[in-house]
């Protein structure tokens, strides 16, 4: 652990001084992309954009902003995710609130959104199982690739805390017709006559035994429930694939995000359930 106090902080007068110092602290703490994170935290604290920073890099930083900045730098040096410190991230060009109750949306999942968008239109009914932050279903709705009527865009999650985050993201992205349902998989959907053109899911898919070896930022700060795919990582693919036929329209699609080494096994699951 690294501890910083007034005795080991060099003189910091300008914007540039602060960011350089922040980057140095993060580099010493083995943070990936320390320069990027140091600048992002500075922009967050000061409320300026990159262009303003570059133009005014030699401006004097006020003491209160510097104090806040150093607090955030120390948090980041302890491997608290950048997005958790700021409370938001960007996904598919839109802002999303994130916290310890949801996975931070990742670039790989943007690819899933792109692929589903190719299969959908403004008339499509889409179910996002294990919705988490809501980034998948909200992105599709924002793109106009879901039906805007009842049950046109549905996100399901077992976690009420995650659904609270998704509700906030639905509000800030102005897609009021996205329906969020608390349910253990399909349980709360049974008997409601819901049918979908696409079921999409980025479920928990990491084998339990692997989680303890994950990067500290994931292992300690992402919710375990959103990571753990049981013994072989495939539990939720089996459940969703088994139930999907009851909720898909004829010629509907089932779309998954999968782990880098799971393609063959998930294909086998899909084949085994027809």
Where in the sequence are the language-model features?
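Conserved SAM/SAH cofactor-binding pocket of Class I
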Residues: 107-213, 261
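Non-catalytic accessory regions of SAM-dependent methyltransferases
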Residues: 1-46, 53-54
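Conserved AdoMet
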Residues: 44-119
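Conserved Class I SAM-dependent methyltransferase catalytic core
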Residues: 231-274
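Class I S-adenosylmethionine-dependent transferase superfamily signal
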Residues: 116, 140, 218, 240, ...
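Short clusters of hydrophobic/aromatic residues that line enzyme substrate/ligand-binding pockets
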Residues: 53, 61, 86, 189, ...
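Mobile active-site "lid"/loop adjacent to the S-adenosyl-L-methionine
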Residues: 149, 205-235
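Conserved hydrophobic residues forming the short capping helix/wall of the S-adenosyl-L-methionine
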Residues: 26, 144, 170, 244, ...
């Amino acid at each position: 652990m690294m501890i910083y106090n007034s005795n080991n902080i060099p003189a910091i007068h300008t914007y540039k001084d602060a960011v350089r110092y922040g980057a140095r602290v993060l580099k010493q703490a083995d943070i990936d992309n320390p320069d990027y994170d140091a600048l992002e935290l500075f922009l967050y604290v000061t409320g300026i954009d990159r262009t303003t920073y570059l133009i005014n890099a030699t401006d004097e930083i006020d003491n209160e902003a510097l104090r806040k900045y150093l607090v955030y730098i120390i948090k980041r040096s302890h491997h608290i995710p950048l997005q958790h410190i700021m409370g938001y991230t960007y996904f598919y060009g839109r802002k999303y609130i994130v916290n310890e109750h949801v996975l931070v949306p990742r670039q790989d999942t943007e690819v899933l959104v792109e692929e589903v968008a190719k299969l959908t239109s403004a008339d499509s009914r889409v179910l996002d199982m294990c919705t988490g932050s809501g980034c998948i279903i909200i992105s599709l709705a924002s793109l106009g690739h879901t039906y805007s009527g009842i049950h046109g865009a549905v996100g399901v999650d077992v976690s009420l805390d995650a659904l609270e985050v998704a509700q906030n993201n639905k509000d800030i992205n102005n897609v009021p017709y996205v329906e969020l349902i608390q349910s253990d998989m399909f349980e709360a959907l049974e008997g409601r006559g819901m049918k979908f053109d696409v079921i999409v899911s980025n479920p928990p898919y990491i084998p339990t035994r692997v989680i303890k070896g994950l990067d500290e930022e994931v292992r300690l700060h992402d919710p375990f429930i959103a990571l753990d795919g049981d013994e072989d990582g495939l539990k939720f693919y089996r459940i969703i694939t088994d139930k999907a036929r009851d909720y898909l329209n004829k010629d509907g699609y089932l779309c998954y995000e999968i782990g880098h080494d799971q393609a063959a096994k998930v294909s086998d699951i899909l084949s085994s359930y027809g």
